[in-house]
Design a protein with these regions (language model features):
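Cysteine-rich micro-motifs
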Residues: 38-52, 70, 86-99, 117-119
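Conserved small-residue-rich
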Residues: 67-94, 98, 135-143
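A composition-biased, non-transmembrane "mature-region" signal
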Residues: 8-16, 60, 79-88, 95-98, ...
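Core catalytic machinery and nucleic-acid-binding channels of phosphodiester-processing enzymes
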Residues: 21-23, 90, 154
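C-terminal, charged low-complexity interaction regions
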Residues: 165-199
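Amphipathic alpha-helical packing elements
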Residues: 118-162, 169-178
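N-terminal cysteine/histidine-rich coordination modules
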Residues: 1-81
């Protein structure tokens, strides 16, 4: 079988792919790039040239508090969808009626409004498209190319340099709608559309 139709899993994890990201700019919705910068990250828009450093989270997150009331020591628990930089929740004790703001633990989510986001700013990924109830996505163009090679291969092999446990590898965790041979042509067409995406 020709190498064109074979794919040997290089042992890549999703974490290995999280080196940079292509996202929608929070200012103009154009294409923006998130790259490592001075031991942190920087987002730069290719359309409006907006530049931003980490600080604001644009995606979904949950604020969660589980504490004992400061007055009567009754257990208090609350969880709400949060936005921006929330870090406190106002709570009223059902037992003694005391009201107070408590420090909340913030849990950031990788999905916002049904679409995937980057793990740095929570911005919607540029390279994604809904497929039925699912979403096909990639962090950046190199990630998209690897997915294209995998989808296009008729023979998919576990590579010899495979360094991780089988279930931690990116290709072993792909959803069925991507891995199913019957969806190959549809997926390749979708990947080509994403490669050509301008707006």
């Amino acid at each position: 079988m020709s190498d064109k139709y074979r794919f040997a899993d290089p042992g890549t994890t999703l974490h290995d792919m999280a080196t940079h990201f292509v996202v929608h700019c929070p200012k103009c919705d154009g294409k923006a790039l998130i790259n490592p910068f001075e031991e942190s990250w920087r987002q730069t828009c290719t359309s409006c040239f907006h530049v931003e450093r980490p600080g604001q989270w644009y995606g979904s997150m949950t604020a969660y508090v589980s504490v004992k009331c400061r007055e009567c020591r009754h257990q208090l628990t609350r969880s709400v969808e949060a936005g921006g930089q929330w870090n406190k929740l106002k709570m009223k004790c059902d037992n003694c009626g005391d009201e107070c703001e408590y420090e909340a633990h913030l849990s950031k989510h990788s999905i916002h409004n049904g679409l995937m986001t980057d793990p740095v700013f929570g911005l919607t990924l540029w390279l994604q498209k809904p497929v039925g109830d699912d979403v096909f996505w990639a962090y950046h163009y190199e990630h998209l190319t690897l997915l294209e090679q995998y989808v296009g291969a008729k023979l998919r092999e576990r590579g010899v340099d495979n360094k991780g446990s089988k279930n931690s590898l990116m290709f072993s965790r792909l959803p069925t709608f991507i891995t199913k041979a019957g969806n190959r042509e549809e997926m390749l067409k979708l990947i080509h559309e994403l490669q050509m995406k301008i707006k």
